[in-house]
Amino acid sequence: MFKQNFKNDVVEIRGQKIGLGESKLIKIPIDRLPTGTLIEIPIYVFNGKTLGPTILLQGGLHGDEVNSIELVRRMLIDKSYKIHRGCVIVVPLLNVFGFLNMSRDMHGKDVNRSFPGSKTGSLASRMAYYLMEEITNNVDFAIDFHTGGEQRNNFPQIRYTPEDGIGFELAKIFNAPFMFSSKLIPKSFRNQCFKNNIPVIVYEGGESLRLEENAIQHGIDGTLRVLKHFNMIHRNVEVSKNPTSIHINKRNWIRAKVAGLFTSTVKNGEKVEKGQTLGHIMDTYGETNFTIKSPSNGYIIAKNNFPIINMGDALFHLGNP
């Protein structure tokens, strides 16, 4: 299923060539701050000594998703990218502007809704353009690391495109606690890669602006499983053994039927039964207490950690195998 016509004999990014057995740090200039400070995207390229697949590992597409940045950074520090076959292109932090401003977006625009981008467009559009033109065209497949947003915590999970058979196989190899298919979103990175016949899986773990060790470690372990599967790193690299991913076939958000203060009585990732109490919504005066019950058997694959909620807010993401 995975193609064998590998192209990592010479990898070229921004006019710089990286041959077999070479590694290089490349910085792509994007723009300057109003102070004149140059903002660059750091790209690490680790090319093995023999031909093999080229994989992109990307963090920080959304600037506030710090778990995605930390897990890629930690693998750099731990020297997990000692590649002897194939090539790994590592982008620890794509959305530098969003990161500096602790924001998902870049100047009000979502980079992940800006693909394929434009060389002369907005900052978000230009960043999308350089990612596709300078980096992604080199790769055979990619892992895009994310977290939940707006204080929604995603239990470690892998998402793949329904029509992408290779993505499905990659998701199984990654072996996160949960995996499921997710429809393509127009102008997203995954959508553009699908159009370009580049399989992408998306790892989601934790929530924005919070470092969470469990989410970080699951992301690292899954990435190492993929690298080991393709013999890109040595077999003696230790990876923790997970139970086989639970494949979620149906998902729905349980939403608040009233406004108030929200408390949860279940843990993220927990298996729940139909009718089980999941949490409570109380008014600020202690007069009402609305009980939230599970509509079916399943697993909590994400939960809202924000205590002040309005009617209709998403509280629990329930997944059914």
Residue ranges and their predicted role:
Residues 1-321:
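Structured catalytic-domain cores with a bias toward divalent-metal coordination
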